[in-house]
Amino acid sequence: MIWKRSAVLRFYSVCGLLLLGSQGQFPLTQNVTVVEGGTAILTCRVDQNDNTSLQWSNPAQQTLYFDDKKALRDNRIELVRASWHELSISVSDVSLSDEGQYTCSLFTMPVKTSKAYLTVLGVPEKPQISGFSSPVMEGDLMQLTCKTSGSKPAADIRWFKNDKEIKDVKYLKEEDANRKTFTVSSTLDFRVDRSDDGVAVICRVDHESLNATPQVAMQVLEIHYTPSVKIIPSTPFPQEGQALTLTCESKGKPLPEPVLWTKDGAELPDPDRMVVSGRELNILFLNKTDNGTYRCEATNTIGQSSAEYVLIVHDVPNTLLPTTIIPSLTTAPVTTTVAITTSPSTSASSSSRRDPNSLAGQNGPDHALIGGIVAVVVFVTLCSIFLLGRYLARHKGTYLTNEAKGAEDAPDADTAIINAEGSQVNAEEKKEYFI
């Protein structure tokens, strides 16, 4: 009797110790998120374990691994690490059906468990843009739709035009047939103009399964529009005798056909001097009869457009032509004559026969050179006249011939010199003789 009572006490003591030790053992797990087709790692850890077994089971409560022993025949499930403190397994090529709550069990008294939820992300398919039919006419309303399927959770769609995001769009989300993924679509409405031609409209799909590389679809717009026309002259102030080139700059889609040039609403009056080469109108030897309104017309399959240029031919500037001056050393007065010719005073007949290259050599530097030469000649002439006058003034006075020197009343040489240079007292007695 005593022996039986002692055995019972020992049994309860051992059970109490086991129960007390198991209270400090807890399995630890973490939730896992993986992209569809990826590999999930499920880890269960126990900090204090007295050689108690660990087990992983799937959402259907099927045992996957018991310690290091594989229980379910699934080639996708592999053992990563097995010890008394850790049991880790991997599930490769994860599908949406693998999502759910997995259980790690620690076989103590009682059994302790920890849950880990496996989240599988559905990767959205490459988006597709629909609704564009080329070409689109300028001013039309365009509607583009971007669509993607297979995302879980639902993906986000964003629109960009010229690298600028468009906010005002419509968004629609629908659940797929498997009731796990979503189909998302977005519609963009806008009115196009010629500036949209060649512009890329981008639909971008953002989703957490794509990391930093979003999926995109691009649509390049093709817009047809009427031509725009502008006339560019080769010189801003055309003059008589010059040549003038008018360039008709036209832009349109389709590209405009060869342009049409007219003057004052009619054909060009002088085809010999007014030559059309492509988009250019070349007018040779301008004259006043060329004045008028020139019109350039450009046409494509969408429409027609034109531009006008009013031509005013200016007169040739006045030209100064000085005459050559020959200096003279005589006492006669010197007269300087400058001849000025003006083109407006010439007759109509002479202007019509004028050589357009006759004024090519008369420019600013030649006029300055001629003016400088004239100034030097005038200065030398004036200096010569002044010196000649001084010379004549100094040699003016009384001079005696040889016959006069023998007369009784003839003054001596010294007196004659003095009278020639000094002041004269009696003007009536002086006589002038020239040798």
Curated annotation (Swiss-Prot):
Transmembrane segments: 368-388
Protein's UniProt keywords contain Membrane: yes
PTM comment: Glycosylation at Asn-51 reduces adhesive binding.
Location of the region described as Disordered in the Swiss-Prot/TrEMBL record: 341-360
GO CC annotation terms, alphabetical: axon; GABA-ergic synapse; glutamatergic synapse; neuronal cell body membrane; postsynaptic membrane
Keywords per UniProt: Cell adhesion, Cell membrane, Cell projection, Disulfide bond, Glycoprotein, Immunoglobulin domain, Membrane, Phosphoprotein, Repeat, Signal, Synapse, Transmembrane, Transmembrane helix
Positions of glycan attachment: 31, 51, 291
Recorded topology in the membrane: Single-pass type I membrane protein
Residues in compartment: Cytoplasmic: 389-435
Domain Ig-like V-type residues, every copy: 27-119
Main localization, broad class: membrane
Stored SMART domains: 4.1m, IG, IGc2
Domain Ig-like C2-type: 127-219, 227-312
Signal peptide region: 1-24
Keyword set includes Repeat: yes
Subcellular location: Cell membrane; Synapse; Cell projection, Axon
Compositionally skewed regions (Low complexity) per UniProt: 341-351
Parts forming coiled coils: none
Family: Belongs to the nectin family.
Protein name from the UniProt record: Cell adhesion molecule 2
Organism: Rattus norvegicus
UniProt lineage: Eukaryota, Metazoa, Chordata, Craniata, Vertebrata
